[in-house]
């Protein structure tokens, strides 16, 4: 794969695009299908590094997952809640925090079995205690470096007990790990979040037959009861709105552009970017709405807009657009006035420190971006000059810098551009098609 990409500024985007399957749903379809009874067929799976790491780990746990080919449905033979095997080797999660955190929850209650999880250099420096601590409250035996906060992680499967757990931050990965553990815990497990996070796990568990309910203000309290069994399903995975966001913003800020993004997941816990686009005054409409397997989908048509307004992102909306902050930082550079991103310290422990990296790289174009402890301040109406920028191995940074390059005067280079393949393997081909 080409590690350096050259992007010419001054072109517009025209056409339609179908983004890859949702990464969050792809992980969950594999995991929940593996512990269901019977067969689960998955269509629209994201064929990229992170979900494939999940598939590889599940195979080592004895799950029959065939070779996954691009753009082809496949069928898993589930083992039931008690059928996972003790692996003969270490489970390598690659660069995928979702894989590691969800597997911690899945495996904590697999009694009398031992599991070791590791990842690449980057993943092994990311915080895992936020999952390990609540699982320990349920009786989980989880160990790792730095008092259980860093991988490699060792799990001694143990009998778990249901309890009420309040999470300090709204995190779908933490919540999902607790809910997966709750399937094997005695009694009832309740998760209470400070704000609602993405709810793909709850929707999918319910579709598979789990006894799960969502309560409280804004769905912040999720309750799951053990004792049932999951039944295999047919899962159609919609396009990932986090991947669609690059085209949504590009079409908004690049003059004379019009893009139709087809079959995008519109789960309300993921559509914070639409709220921000409304604040900006973007020109878009949602077409062909429908619901498949409990997940709302539709197509998004976006046209370029003049005189976009600055915006502030803070508080409860953060979990609904946490992965879109890099591309929204690019958008802010071309709005009138000063935009601000607050309460976003979670971005410092993603694949990279995304606040620091986005500020550093956009400044190379001439952007006025100031880094704060919990966010960024962006002075809009920037005039971008061409630059040599670096993804610093972060997929969302790579794609955000590509869109920024379209607004630069001259030709820019993006180093380590192949990082995009982590979540969007065909990004560069789709960019070429839309700008041709």
From Swiss-Prot:
It is an enzyme of class 2 (transferase). Its main location: cytoplasm. This is 3-phosphoshikimate 1-carboxyvinyltransferase. Phosphoenolpyruvate binds at residues 23, 97, 126, 173, 354, 396. Keywords: Amino-acid biosynthesis, Aromatic amino acid biosynthesis, Cytoplasm, Transferase. SUPFAM superfamilies: EPT/RTPC-like. Its EC number is 2.5.1.19. It catalyses: 3-phosphoshikimate + phosphoenolpyruvate = 5-O-(1-carboxyvinyl)-3-phosphoshikimate + phosphate. Pathway: Metabolic intermediate biosynthesis; chorismate biosynthesis; chorismate from D-erythrose 4-phosphate and phosphoenolpyruvate: step 6/7. The lineage of its organism: Bacteria, Bacillati, Cyanobacteriota, Cyanophyceae, Synechococcales. Monomer. It comes from Prochlorococcus marinus (strain AS9601). InterPro entries: Enolpyruvate_Tfrase_dom (IPR001986), Enolpyruvate_Tfrase_sf (IPR036968), EPSP_synthase (IPR006264), EPSP_synthase_CS (IPR023193), RNA3'P_cycl/enolpyr_Trfase_a/b (IPR013792). Belongs to the EPSP synthase family.
